Amino acid sequence: CAVNESQVYKLADTTSFEEGAMTEPVACCLHGLDMCNITPASTVLVIGGGMIGLLMVQLAKLAGAHEIILSEPVAVKREMGLKMGATLTVDPINDNIPALLADKGIHRINTVIECAGLPATIKQAISLAGNKSVVMMFGLTKPDDEVAIKPFEIFQKEIEIKASFINPYTQQRALDLINSKKIDVSSMVCDICSLDKLADILSKPELRNKGKYIINPWQ
C-alpha cells in the first residue's frame, strides 16, 4: 500500500522491526509525560505496571525524576519496574501505600500517572497526589465509567487533573529514543507469536500477565 511520506519514519540499522512496532505507544506516553511537569526534584507515582506503565517509568527517569514509585499487584511486573528505573515498588492489594511511603521518607508525590484505567485507581491517584501535584489520567477507561471524587480534596491540595490523547507530534522523538537505545522496549515483549496463537493469549490471563506479545502474522 502507499503511505504519505510524512507518515513514514526511518528505523536505525540497529533497530529491529519488533522494536519499531513499539514507536506508537512510546509516542503516546511521551505526549502524556510532556504534560506532567516533571523536574529533577520530582517524586513520581506510576499506577499500573503493564507495558504503558513500564514505559512511563523509563520516561520519568529520563525526565530526571528523583523518586519513581510503581504501584502494581503482579510481582513479576514489579520486578520489571525496578529493572526499568523505579526506585520503589508497592503492591496496591497488600500494602498500606501511605504508611509504606511515609516509612521510606516519601511525604509528597508531585506527579501521579494513572495507567490502569480503572475508576478505583483514578480515585487512588487523586488520594495519593500531594499538594500542587499533577494527576495524569493516562489509562483508558470504559466510555461509560464514572468516578466518584471529592471536589474539596482537589481544591484543598490544588491538584491539576490532566488527560492525554494519542500522540500528536511525538512520533519522531519516540523513534529517536528507541533508535538510540535510551529506552528499552525489548524487555517488555515476552514473546513474538503467530496469528493462530492470538485467541489463546487473549483468553488466558496467566499468559497476558507475562507481558506484551507481538503478533507476527507471517510467522
Enumerate the predicted regions with their spans.
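Residues in the short beta-alpha loop(s) of Rossmann-like NAD(P)-binding domains
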Residues: P73-V74, T141, N167
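Glycine-rich cofactor phosphate-binding loops and adjacent beta1-alpha1 units
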Residues: C36, E79, K83-E158
